[in-house]
Structures are given as C-alpha cells and as structure tokens.
C-alpha cells in the first residue's frame, strides 16, 4: 500500500500527481498522521486520477531548483527557480535567475534527454548534498519567466527545431 511505501522510504516524502503542472496538488508529508490524512482524502475524492501518484523522497535543497531547456538534444539555457517555500515553481511565486550551464549540468541534461528520445524538454533538477538530481523531465515546456534571465529566445529555438524536424 501507499502508506507502507511511505513508511519504508521514511519521512519526509513528497506526494505528487502523475499528471499535473505548476506545483499543484503536491504535498510534503512529515509524519504518519499526515500521510494517513492525505491518503484518505485521495481515496474519498473519488476521481480516478487522485488514486495514482508518485511518492518521492524529500530532498533538502538550497531554496531553489534548476529548470534546464533541452531542444533537439541541445541544452539551450537554464534558470534557478528560487522561493522561501519548498515548492520552487514560478506559478507558485518562485523567482527566476540565470543558471550558468556547467559541463556537469549540461552532461546530466544531455543524458536525461537522450534517455527519453529528446525533442523539446524542460528538465527540472535539484542540487543535493550528493550533486544534481533529475526531478522531472517535462515534454510540455513551460518557459514563463525564463527568456529574460537566460537571454535565449526559447520559443524561437522551439520553432526552429520543429521546422528542421518537419523537413
């Protein structure tokens, strides 16, 4: 059961819908009572999509995560998404700033993109005590608040890529 998996992973954990965006319906669970309450809500909300979710290890991060943009196998830019809240999504108020692409970050993004066949991707990473961790690979790319800090015309790069693939 989900409760057993949570107990096995250890607290805190993050419960996250399989389909979702903008940091919605994500819960940080810090103890068994919280887990039981959230799981009960999911069970009785009734909609099928509430019954399928990820259980992720909670990762301590420095008040930010990284969103990198990979288009056609090329990492074109990245931003930090910073927030005082543990959810570092711009739709939830996080602020963006430029993230320099180190060779390590670029290599991880390349490998993540290659693992799923590339295309147009937004790869969300976290900085942990063990290095970079890939949290999500998004094929529906949200680049709001990312064009200015990166200095990259992300929609233009997407259009160029799509045209080149169509030829």
Each language-model region and where it sits:
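C-terminal active-site "lid" helix and adjoining low-complexity regulatory extension at the edge
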Residues: 114, 127-167
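Residues within well-ordered alpha-helical secondary structure of globular protein domains
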Residues: 8, 41-44, 164
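Phosphate-binding site of ATP-dependent enzymes
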Residues: 24-116
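A short glycine-rich, hydrophobically flanked beta-strand micro-motif that places a catalytic Asp/Glu
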Residues: 56-57, 118-129
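A conserved helix-loop-beta module that forms one wall/lid of the active-site cleft
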Residues: 1-25
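Protein kinase-like catalytic core scaffold
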Residues: 13, 54, 77, 121, ...
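Short strand-connecting beta-turns/loops that link adjacent beta-strands
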Residues: 20, 73, 128-131
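Short, solvent-exposed loop/turn segments at secondary-structure junctions
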Residues: 20, 83, 140
């Amino acid at each position: 059961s989900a409760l057993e998996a949570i107990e096995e992973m250890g607290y805190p954990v993050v419960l996250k819908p399989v389909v979702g965006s903008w940091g919605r319906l994500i819960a940080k669970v810090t103890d068994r009572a919280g887990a039981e309450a959230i799981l009960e809500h999911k069970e009785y909300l009734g909609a099928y999509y509430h019954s399928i979710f990820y259980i992720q290890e909670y990762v301590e991060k420095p008040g930010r995560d990284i969103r990198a943009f990979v288009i056609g196998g090329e990492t074109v830019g990245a931003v930090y998404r910073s927030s005082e809240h543990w959810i570092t999504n711009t739709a939830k108020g996080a602020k963006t700033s430029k993230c320099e692409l180190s060779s390590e970050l670029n290599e991880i993004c390349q490998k993540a993109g290659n693992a799923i066949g590339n295309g147009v991707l937004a790869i969300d990473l976290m900085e942990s005590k063990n290095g970079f961790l890939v949290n999500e690979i998004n094929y529906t790319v949200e680049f709001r608040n990312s064009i200015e800090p990166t200095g990259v015309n992300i929609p233009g790069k997407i259009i160029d890529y799509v045209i080149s693939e169509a030829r």
